[in-house]
Amino acid sequence: MSILNLVRADLLNSQNYVPGGESARYRSHANELPWSPVTMGEYNLNYYPNIGLQIELQKQLAKRYQINSDQIILTRGSDDGIDLTTRLFLTAGKDAFMQFPPTFPMYAFYVRLQQAELIECPLDRRTNFRLTLDQIENSWKPNCKVIMFCSPNNPTGNLVDLNLIAKTCELYTNQSIIVVDEAYIEFANAPSATSLIGEFENLIVLRTLSKAFGLAGLRLGCIIAQSPIIQAFNKIIAPYSIATPSMELAKRALNNSDWFTKTIEQIKSSRAWVIKKFADNPIIEKIYPTETNFILIQTRFSKQLATWLARYGIAVRDFPSSSLLHDHLRITVGHDEQNQLLIDALSSFNADVAGLNYEKDFIY
């Protein structure tokens, strides 16, 4: 059985849109204006993005991720990759998508847009959200076309074991596409699932430049998979989907490897410092292990604390009262000044609850 049999049948034989005219001197085929009010280096912004620039950036990223250049395609951030995946594989009213909550809410959003079934396989906070193969097998159904791992997971911060990903790929060969969203993997002390791409044809890895690369404003990411799957994605990606300025700025930024190395180490160091300060705070009842640039904490004062921090201009992520994480906050590690303000604001909040003692369940 071909892995392409998992692609929606109505899309499998569709034709790619090929704009053409890339090398022509006079572009009389695309109805563009001959002038532009602004310029950007050698690129004419009055013209649609050049496919050559996209290929160059894909090759640059392929080298960084240690994959072949035919195993990658650009997206407008990870969200676009999630959207495209649900469109390519899920037939409305027929197919299902498995996720492991608490996790990134946009998975469920795009599944609903596609009118597919959502299979929930909840993680248990008592085990620090650890996932096992038994849990997956107990939740899987024959119509499950996509299994979505978020590693490290947002908002819990923990990794999915690479061996578990490999076993899942093997177990559901020709039955399910296994997707690994690695938006935060650069902050982790662990190998990427891209190392498994050559081994499993049903594996897709999503990467982004929005987090560790500090380029969220460019809206750039990529889908990584074996070549046949990438070719299938090409059938549903709109032409000219990535803007010329985004690609050009990303190319320049990716040349600055020293900056990325230094920045990631700085975040890791700051993360350790913030965790230590949290551990000394009596209102924080639990600190979860994290392999990301954020920290998940448990506190019975979550709603009050979020409101308190907002007075200092600090926005943190809290969760609905109906959520498993209703008494938790997700807090991003920032620069030194931002981190110090956070700790100072927490200390001032403590003054309002001084004298109260709570048992803590610290991981660190």
Swiss-Prot record:
Its EC number is 2.6.1.9. Pathway: Amino-acid biosynthesis; L-histidine biosynthesis; L-histidine from 5-phospho-alpha-D-ribose 1-diphosphate: step 7/9. Keywords: Amino-acid biosynthesis, Aminotransferase, Histidine biosynthesis, Pyridoxal phosphate, Transferase. The keyword Amino-acid biosynthesis applies. GO terms for biological process: L-histidine biosynthetic process. One of its GO terms (molecular function) is pyridoxal phosphate binding. Its cofactor is pyridoxal 5'-phosphate. Homodimer. The modification N6-(pyridoxal phosphate)lysine is found at residue 211. It catalyses: L-histidinol phosphate + 2-oxoglutarate = 3-(imidazol-4-yl)-2-oxopropyl phosphate + L-glutamate. Belongs to the class-II pyridoxal-phosphate-dependent aminotransferase family. Histidinol-phosphate aminotransferase subfamily. The gene is hisC1. Pfam families: Aminotran_1_2. This is Histidinol-phosphate aminotransferase 1.
